[in-house]
Amino acid sequence: MPLHLPHKLKTYQKNYNISYTEMFGINPKTEKNQIKTFPHHMLPSDLSGVINVCPGAGNCKRTCLHFAGNPAYMKGKNAKRLRQTIAFAADNSLYLETLFLAICRAIYKHQGETIAFRLNATSDIMWENLTFNLSPDVADFAQYKFGIKISAGKYDNILQVFLD
Protein backbone atom coordinates (compact mmCIF):
# COMPACT_ATOMS: atom_id res chain seq x y z
CA MET A 1 0.00 0.00 0.00
CA PRO A 2 1.34 3.44 -0.88
CA LEU A 3 2.24 5.69 2.02
CA HIS A 4 2.36 8.79 -0.14
CA LEU A 5 0.13 10.47 -2.66
CA PRO A 6 0.73 8.89 -6.09
CA HIS A 7 3.36 10.80 -8.07
CA LYS A 8 1.09 11.80 -10.96
CA LEU A 9 -1.47 13.33 -8.57
CA LYS A 10 1.19 14.99 -6.45
CA THR A 11 2.70 16.58 -9.56
CA TYR A 12 -0.72 17.65 -10.85
CA GLN A 13 -1.66 19.24 -7.52
CA LYS A 14 1.70 20.99 -7.31
CA ASN A 15 1.46 22.31 -10.88
CA TYR A 16 -1.95 23.87 -10.24
CA ASN A 17 -1.43 24.72 -6.56
CA ILE A 18 -4.44 22.70 -5.41
CA SER A 19 -4.73 19.97 -2.79
CA TYR A 20 -7.24 17.25 -2.05
CA THR A 21 -7.04 18.40 1.58
CA GLU A 22 -8.41 21.83 0.63
CA MET A 23 -10.91 21.10 -2.16
CA PHE A 24 -13.98 22.04 -0.18
CA GLY A 25 -14.78 25.55 0.89
CA ILE A 26 -16.90 26.99 3.62
CA ASN A 27 -20.25 28.63 3.33
CA PRO A 28 -22.08 30.37 6.18
CA LYS A 29 -25.42 29.07 4.88
CA THR A 30 -24.34 25.43 4.79
CA GLU A 31 -22.71 25.78 8.22
CA LYS A 32 -26.19 26.41 9.62
CA ASN A 33 -27.45 23.07 8.27
CA GLN A 34 -28.04 20.21 10.66
CA ILE A 35 -26.14 18.02 8.22
CA LYS A 36 -22.45 18.84 7.73
CA THR A 37 -22.17 19.96 4.10
CA PHE A 38 -19.00 20.23 2.03
CA PRO A 39 -19.37 22.82 -0.74
CA HIS A 40 -17.09 22.55 -3.77
CA HIS A 41 -16.49 25.88 -5.48
CA MET A 42 -15.12 26.90 -8.82
CA LEU A 43 -14.88 30.32 -10.38
CA PRO A 44 -18.38 30.59 -11.84
CA SER A 45 -19.52 30.97 -15.41
CA ASP A 46 -16.75 32.13 -17.75
CA LEU A 47 -14.89 34.26 -15.19
CA SER A 48 -11.80 32.03 -15.36
CA GLY A 49 -11.21 32.94 -19.00
CA VAL A 50 -10.38 29.27 -19.57
CA ILE A 51 -13.64 27.33 -19.31
CA ASN A 52 -17.29 28.15 -18.75
CA VAL A 53 -18.42 26.01 -15.81
CA CYS A 54 -21.95 27.46 -16.00
CA PRO A 55 -22.84 27.21 -19.69
CA GLY A 56 -26.50 28.03 -19.06
CA ALA A 57 -25.84 31.08 -16.90
CA GLY A 58 -28.21 33.96 -17.47
CA ASN A 59 -29.33 36.46 -14.87
CA CYS A 60 -27.93 34.25 -12.12
CA LYS A 61 -24.43 35.28 -13.24
CA ARG A 62 -24.87 38.69 -11.61
CA THR A 63 -26.35 37.33 -8.37
CA CYS A 64 -24.19 34.23 -8.04
CA LEU A 65 -23.38 32.91 -4.58
CA HIS A 66 -19.72 33.43 -5.49
CA PHE A 67 -20.08 37.18 -4.93
CA ALA A 68 -21.66 36.80 -1.48
CA GLY A 69 -19.74 37.08 1.74
CA ASN A 70 -17.17 39.35 3.27
CA PRO A 71 -15.33 41.40 0.60
CA ALA A 72 -12.13 41.12 2.65
CA TYR A 73 -11.92 37.43 1.66
CA MET A 74 -12.77 37.90 -2.04
CA LYS A 75 -9.16 38.00 -3.30
CA GLY A 76 -8.23 34.69 -1.66
CA LYS A 77 -11.55 33.11 -2.56
CA ASN A 78 -11.13 34.12 -6.21
CA ALA A 79 -7.56 32.82 -6.33
CA LYS A 80 -8.43 29.37 -4.96
CA ARG A 81 -11.48 29.00 -7.16
CA LEU A 82 -9.52 30.10 -10.21
CA ARG A 83 -6.78 27.53 -9.50
CA GLN A 84 -9.37 24.77 -9.13
CA THR A 85 -11.19 25.82 -12.30
CA ILE A 86 -7.98 25.93 -14.33
CA ALA A 87 -6.89 22.55 -12.94
CA PHE A 88 -10.27 21.06 -13.91
CA ALA A 89 -10.03 22.52 -17.43
CA ALA A 90 -6.45 21.25 -17.86
CA ASP A 91 -7.15 17.62 -16.91
CA ASN A 92 -10.54 16.70 -15.58
CA SER A 93 -9.49 13.05 -15.08
CA LEU A 94 -6.81 13.99 -12.56
CA TYR A 95 -9.14 16.61 -11.09
CA LEU A 96 -11.77 13.93 -10.51
CA GLU A 97 -9.21 11.72 -8.76
CA THR A 98 -8.25 14.68 -6.57
CA LEU A 99 -11.93 15.32 -5.81
CA PHE A 100 -12.37 11.61 -5.08
CA LEU A 101 -9.64 11.79 -2.43
CA ALA A 102 -11.19 14.95 -0.96
CA ILE A 103 -14.51 13.13 -0.59
CA CYS A 104 -12.80 10.08 0.94
CA ARG A 105 -10.99 12.33 3.41
CA ALA A 106 -14.23 14.02 4.49
CA ILE A 107 -15.98 10.66 4.91
CA TYR A 108 -13.05 9.39 6.99
CA LYS A 109 -12.91 12.50 9.19
CA HIS A 110 -16.66 12.40 9.84
CA GLN A 111 -17.21 8.68 10.35
CA GLY A 112 -20.56 7.91 11.93
CA GLU A 113 -21.99 11.29 10.91
CA THR A 114 -24.43 12.08 8.14
CA ILE A 115 -22.65 14.39 5.72
CA ALA A 116 -23.42 15.90 2.34
CA PHE A 117 -21.45 17.19 -0.61
CA ARG A 118 -22.48 20.10 -2.80
CA LEU A 119 -20.25 19.70 -5.84
CA ASN A 120 -21.83 22.61 -7.71
CA ALA A 121 -21.78 25.34 -5.09
CA THR A 122 -20.70 27.91 -7.70
CA SER A 123 -20.74 25.96 -10.96
CA ASP A 124 -23.11 23.93 -13.12
CA ILE A 125 -20.84 21.08 -14.12
CA MET A 126 -22.74 17.96 -15.05
CA TRP A 127 -20.68 15.61 -12.89
CA GLU A 128 -23.04 12.77 -13.77
CA ASN A 129 -21.85 13.02 -17.41
CA LEU A 130 -18.10 12.86 -16.69
CA THR A 131 -16.61 9.38 -16.89
CA PHE A 132 -14.45 8.67 -13.84
CA ASN A 133 -11.35 6.50 -14.14
CA LEU A 134 -10.01 5.52 -10.73
CA SER A 135 -6.42 4.38 -11.09
CA PRO A 136 -5.12 1.49 -8.97
CA ASP A 137 -2.53 3.68 -7.23
CA VAL A 138 -5.14 6.26 -6.17
CA ALA A 139 -7.55 3.51 -5.06
CA ASP A 140 -4.76 1.93 -3.00
CA PHE A 141 -3.82 5.30 -1.48
CA ALA A 142 -7.47 5.92 -0.47
CA GLN A 143 -7.64 2.50 1.17
CA TYR A 144 -4.37 2.99 3.05
CA LYS A 145 -4.94 6.61 4.07
CA PHE A 146 -8.68 6.56 4.77
CA GLY A 147 -9.64 2.90 5.05
CA ILE A 148 -12.03 3.26 2.13
CA LYS A 149 -11.88 0.31 -0.22
CA ILE A 150 -13.15 1.14 -3.68
CA SER A 151 -12.13 -0.85 -6.72
CA ALA A 152 -10.02 0.81 -9.35
CA GLY A 153 -11.57 1.02 -12.77
CA LYS A 154 -13.84 2.97 -15.05
CA TYR A 155 -17.08 4.36 -13.62
CA ASP A 156 -19.89 6.18 -15.40
CA ASN A 157 -19.19 9.13 -13.10
CA ILE A 158 -17.72 10.02 -9.71
CA LEU A 159 -21.16 9.85 -8.10
CA GLN A 160 -21.48 6.16 -9.00
CA VAL A 161 -18.44 5.34 -6.88
CA PHE A 162 -20.15 6.51 -3.71
CA LEU A 163 -23.79 5.72 -4.49
CA ASP A 164 -23.52 2.09 -5.60
Language-model features and meaning:
Residues 1-164:
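Class I S-adenosyl-L-methionine
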